[in-house]
């Protein structure tokens, strides 16, 4: 599913946006072998404690309170704004005048964290000192204009690309520094839904969804069937189990990809423009499905007392999806976060760029240039 690491070695051979499928029939997220290792050029910018944070069932609420755990260094709480960073090389303060870099508190540790990440492809600088977090247990969104590196962020999370400088942490562990075996295991934490569902054309729907279980577990066929049918039921495709991908509508393929992304019970689910190609009604229905499954996974995490809460990250251009679905919003522009925070804070932001983008208005700092 991931393709190879040629883009990291070859620079401008990799597109800045779009799914890293590589073939017409990509494998599921955890199916590809780890690429050749390469450490990030820059050292990690900050130390991270590894204490366990409090789970919701330990605090009596749905969210662990800020500062209530040993991992408080990873909890997103803003006491005061840090000094404004200098613009990247070759850019001016005017280029980043709308970037306040303000991060409103989420009260949760970050499941994924980008620390001063720089990434270029040839002469094209995509990430330019990116600092961004995905709070654990929330549905986060990365939104922003086209070509700002949103899909590049996904590839960094799973170790398909490595920073030229900076670090990427998953549950406090540095992805660029992981040995091959650890990287391969880390990828199993992730489920990934591409724009088109990324199904194998030669397999029916049932076998597509069952593939990760058969490939990466020793479960019996009876166990596989129980899991697959449960996931197909969640996305409303129980009656389509024998259909081939070319017999499915675009929306059905996305839901099938969603079911397959869930079968290994990932801690982190990544959605790369899941609403692409869908009409407004089906986009709204998909958003409701994302929220429903996230709620179900949160309840399951409480019952099982899992170490980590389920974290969803949705990349989208659709403002309505962001308004309906997001718990937390990161607004990315020019390779850096303009502002980030819980959706209520972001939807009420006084930043002219944030207001323009989240209101889908023509008047504002963002132009056709």
Model regions: which residues?
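Conserved ABC ATPase signature
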Residues: 244-248, 252
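Helix-to-loop junction immediately C-terminal to a conserved catalytic motif
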Residues: 158
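Conserved catalytic motifs of ABC-family nucleotide-binding domains
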Residues: 265
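Catalytic Walker B motif of ABC-type/P-loop ATPase nucleotide-binding domains
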Residues: 269-272
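Conserved ABC ATPase "signature" region
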Residues: 173-174, 221-239, 291
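ABC ATPase NBD coupling module
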Residues: 175-191, 221, 346-349
């Amino acid at each position: 599913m991931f393709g190879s690491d040629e883009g990291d070695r070859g620079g401008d051979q990799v597109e800045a946006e779009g799914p890293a499928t590589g073939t017409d029939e990509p494998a599921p997220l955890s199916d590809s072998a780890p690429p050749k290792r390469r450490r990030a050029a820059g050292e990690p910018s900050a130390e991270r404690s590894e204490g366990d944070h409090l789970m919701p069932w330990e605090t009596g609420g749905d969210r662990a309170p800020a500062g209530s755990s040993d991992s408080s260094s990873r909890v997103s709480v803003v006491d005061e704004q840090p000094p404004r960073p200098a613009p990247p090389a070759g850019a001016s303060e005017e280029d980043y005048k709308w970037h306040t870099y303000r991060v409103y508190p989420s009260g949760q540790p970050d499941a994924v964290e980008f620390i001063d990440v720089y990434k270029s492809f040839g002469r094209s600088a995509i990430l330019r000192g990116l600092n961004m977090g995905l709070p654990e247990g929330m549905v986060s969104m990365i939104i922003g204009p086209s070509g700002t590196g949103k899909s590049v962020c996904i590839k960094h999370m799973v170790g398909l690309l490595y920073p030229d400088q900076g670090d990427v942490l998953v549950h406090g562990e540095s992805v660029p520094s992981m040995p091959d075996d650890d990287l391969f295991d880390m990828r199993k934490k992730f489920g990934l839904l591409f724009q088109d569902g990324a199904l194998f054309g030669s397999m029916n729907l049932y076998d597509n969804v069952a593939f990760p279980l058969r490939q990466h577990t020793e479960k019996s066929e009876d166990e596989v069937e129980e899991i697959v049918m449960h996931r197909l039921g969640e996305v409303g495709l129980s009656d389509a189990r024998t259909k081939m991908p070319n017999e499915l509508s675009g929306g059905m393929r996305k839901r099938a990809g969603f079911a397959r992304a869930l079968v290994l019970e990932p801690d982190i689910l990544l959605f790369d423009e899941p609403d692409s190609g869908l009409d407004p009604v089906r986009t709204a229905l998909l958003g409701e499905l994302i929220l429903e499954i996230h709620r179900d996974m949160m309840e399951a995490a409480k019952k099982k007392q899992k170490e980590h809460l389920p974290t969803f990250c949705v990349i989208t251009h659709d403002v309505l999806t962001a308004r309906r679905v997001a718990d937390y919003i990161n607004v990315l522009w020019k390779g850096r976060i303009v502002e980030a925070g819980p959706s209520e804070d972001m939807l009420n932001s006084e930043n002219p760029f944030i207001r323009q983008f989240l209101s889908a208005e023509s008047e504002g700092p963002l132009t056709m240039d």
